[in-house]
C-alpha cells in the first residue's frame, strides 16, 4: 500500500490590488493543519475532496500536512508563505523516507511580497529536499485553468494536471484524474513534461471554455490525447491576466511517456489553433447605455437581463463593491433591479436599524479609489442573516475554491421601489444562485441582475436569463488590459 504526503496552497493573486492577503484571509477561507486537512475537506466537493476520496478508496495512507486557501485578492504576505512552508517542510523532512508520492492542490497564479512564483519556489524546495536525501518520489500538482505556469513549476514537479472547464465545474474531477496519474507514477511509469509559454495575455472574459479560443484549443488537445497513447495529458492554461509577472499568460503543457519531440510538435499545433482563434480572446464590451438600448430592443420573454460587470469580477480578486454600473443603472429610474455589494459597514447599519426599518445608506466603493464612489440608497431592511449558505450547484466554480458550504459574513437585504440589494460582509463571487436564494432574493423574477463576474457565473445564471450583456466599467479586473500599469510583461501581447 502506498503512502502519500498531501498539502494545499491555493491563491490567485491580483498584483494591482492595494490590500495584501495576510494569514487571516486564509484562516477565513481554508486553513487546515494535520488531520483537519482530511476532516474538513473529505466530502465537500473540492479538489482536496477529489484527491482524498480517491486515495482512501485505494487504501493509501495519506499524511496530511497543511491545506490553505484564500479568495483571490492582493499579493500574499510572506508570513502566510512561511507558515505553509514551516509546517509542510517539517513534515517532509520527517516523513520523506516513508512516502511513495507527494500530492499538492495548487492554483498556479500565486504571488507574494517577495516571490513572483510561489508555486515554483515551493516545488523547487521540495525537489531540493528529495535530492539531498537521495530519494526519487513523484510530485503531482493540481492547477487552476488560470495558472500562470513557470518553467520552475514544470522542472520541479513530475506531473501537473489543470482544470479543463471554465467555469471550473471539473475541479474535483481534475484532482481525481491527477490522483490516478500519481498511482501510475508510483507504480513505475515515467513521464516527461514539455512546457510551452506563449506571449498572449487574455482577459478572463476571453477564456471561457465554451467559447473561442479556448473551445478549439481544448478540443484539439483532447483529440491528441485520444489519438496518442503516449500522452498522459495536455494542459491548456489560460493564465491569470492580473498577475504582473514575467510568466503571466496563456501556456500549454504536455506530459508524455514517449518522445519529447513529438510532444513538442503537438504543442506547436495547439499554438497555431490558439492564434487562428485569437481575436475572440479579446472581447469587446458595451457601455451601459448600449447594453440597455439592446436590451430594450429584445422581444418580451421570461427571465432577467444580466448586466455583467467583469471589471469588478469578485472571482478575479476585486472588492465586489464597485458602483460604476449600479449607480448609473439606478439613475435611469428603471426598476426590478437585483444586485449584491460587499459592504460590511452598510450591513452593520442595517443590523443596528433592524428588519423592517426604513434606512438611508451610503453603499459601495469603500475599499479603494478604483471602483467608483459610494451611492445613496434609501429603502427598507428586508432581511438580516449570518450569510451562510449551501451551494445549489455542487460542482460549481465556487466549489472548486471553497467546497459546497459558503460564508459571506453577516448580510442584509435592503429594498425600495427600484431595487433589491444584498449587502455582504465578505466578498462572495456570484457563482451560485444559493447566494441570493438563501437570503430570500429571487433573481429569476427580476428585470435586471447585476453580476460581478467574467465567466464563472455562467452555469448558475445563464439558465435563468433572457439575455446577457457585458458592460465596460473602470475596475481593476477590466477586460481592457492596456489600462493597467504592467511593469514585468516584457514582450507580452495584451490586445489585438
How should these model regions be labeled?
Residues 5, 9-11, 18, 78-85, ...:
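Active-site histidine-anchored catalytic micro-motif
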Residues 52-80, 84-92:
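Low-complexity, highly charged intrinsically disordered N-terminal segments
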Residues 21-23, 120, 268-272, 321-333, ...:
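Short, solvent-exposed amphipathic alpha-helical segments in soluble enzyme
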Residues 186-215:
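Internal, active-site/partner-interface "lid" segment
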Residues 205-418, 422-426:
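Hard-cation-handling environments
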Residues 1, 56-60, 64, 90-100, ...:
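Glycine-rich phosphate/diphosphate-binding loops that line cofactor/substrate pockets in enzymes
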Residues 1-57:
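N-terminal amphipathic/basic leader segments beginning at the initiator methionine
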Residues 45, 64, 275, 392-496:
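Extended hydrophobic packing segments that form well-structured cores
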Amino acid at each position: 500500500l502506498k503512502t502519500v504526503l498531501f498539502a494545499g496552497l491555493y491563491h490567485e493573486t491580483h498584483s494591482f490590488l492595494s490590500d495584501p492577503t495576510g494569514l487571516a484571509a486564509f484562516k477565513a477561507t481554508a486553513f487546515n493543519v494535520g488531520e483537519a486537512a482530511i476532516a474538513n475537506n473529505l466530502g465537500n466537493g473540492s479538489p482536496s475532496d477529489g484527491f482524498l476520496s480517491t486515495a482512501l478508496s485505494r487504501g493509501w495512507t495519506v499524511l496530511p500536512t497543511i491545506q490553505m486557501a484564500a479568495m483571490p485578492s492582493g499579493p500574499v504576505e510572506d508570513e502566510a508563505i512561511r507558515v505553509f512552508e514551516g509546517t509542510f517542510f517539517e513534515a517532509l523532512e520527517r516523513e520523506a523516507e516513508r512516502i511513495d508520492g507527494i500530492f499538492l492542490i495548487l492554483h498556479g497564479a500565486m504571488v507574494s511580497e517577495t516571490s513572483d512564483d510561489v508555486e515554483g519556489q515551493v516545488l523547487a524546495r521540495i525537489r531540493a529536499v528529495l535530492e539531498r536525501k537521495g530519494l526519487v518520489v513523484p510530485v503531482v500538482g493540481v492547477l487552476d485553468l488560470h495558472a500562470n505556469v513557470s518553467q520552475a513549476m514544470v522542472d520541479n514537479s513530475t506531473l501537473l494536471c489543470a482544470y479543463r472547464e471554465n467555469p471550473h465545474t471539473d475541479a474535483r474531477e481534475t484532482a481525481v484524474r491527477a490522483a490516478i496519474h500519481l498511482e501510475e507514477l508510483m507504480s513505475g511509469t515515467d513521464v516527461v513534461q514539455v512546457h510551452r509559454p506563449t506571449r498572449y495575455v487574455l482577459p478572463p472574459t476571453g477564456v471561457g471554455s465554451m467559447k473561442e479560443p479556448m473551445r478549439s484549443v481544448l478540443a484539439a488537445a483532447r483529440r491528441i490525447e485520444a489519438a496518442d497513447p503516449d500522452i498522459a495529458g495536455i494542459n491548456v492554461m489560460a493564465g491569470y491576466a492580473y498577475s504582473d509577472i514575467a510568466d503571466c499568460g496563456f501556456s500549454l503543457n504536455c506530459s508524455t511517456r514517449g518522445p519529447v519531440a513529438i510532444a513538442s510538435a503537438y504543442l506547436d499545433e495547439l499554438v497555431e489553433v490558439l492564434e487562428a482563434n485569437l481575436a475572440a480572446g479579446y472581447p469587446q464590451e458595451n457601455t451601459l447605455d448600449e447594453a440597455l438600448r439592446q436590451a430594450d430592443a429584445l422581444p418580451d420573454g421570461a427571465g432577467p437581463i444580466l448586466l455583467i460587470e467583469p471589471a469588478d469580477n469578485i472571482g478575479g480578486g476585486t472588492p465586489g463593491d464597485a458602483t460604476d454600473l449600479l449607480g448609473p443603472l439606478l439613475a435611469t429610474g428603471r426598476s426590478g433591479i437585483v444586485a449584491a455589494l460587499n459592504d460590511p459597514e452598510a450591513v452593520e447599519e442595517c443590523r443596528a436599524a433592524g428588519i423592517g426599518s426604513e434606512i438611508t445608506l451610503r453603499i459601495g466603493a469603500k475599499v479603494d479609489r478604483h471602483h467608483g464612489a459610494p451611492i445613496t440608497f434609501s429603502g427598507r431592511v428586508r432581511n438580516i442573516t449570518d450569510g451562510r449558505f449551501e451551494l445549489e450547484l455542487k460542482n460549481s466554480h465556487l466549489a472548486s475554491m471553497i467546497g459546497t458550504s459558503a460564508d459571506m459574513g453577516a448580510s442584509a437585504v435592503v429594498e425600495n421601489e427600484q431595487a433589491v440589494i444584498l449587502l455582504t460582509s465578505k466578498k462572495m463571487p456570484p457563482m451560485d444562485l444559493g447566494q441570493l436564494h438563501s437570503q430570500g432574493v429571487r433573481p429569476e423574477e427580476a428585470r435586471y441582475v447585476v453580476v460581478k463576474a467574467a465567466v464563472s457565473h455562467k452555469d448558475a445564471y445563464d439558465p435563468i436569463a433572457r439575455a446577457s450583456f457585458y458592460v465596460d466599467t473602470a475596475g481593476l479586473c477590466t477586460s481592457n488590459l492596456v489600462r493597467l500599469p504592467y511593469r514585468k510583461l516584457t514582450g507580452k501581447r495584451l490586445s489585438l
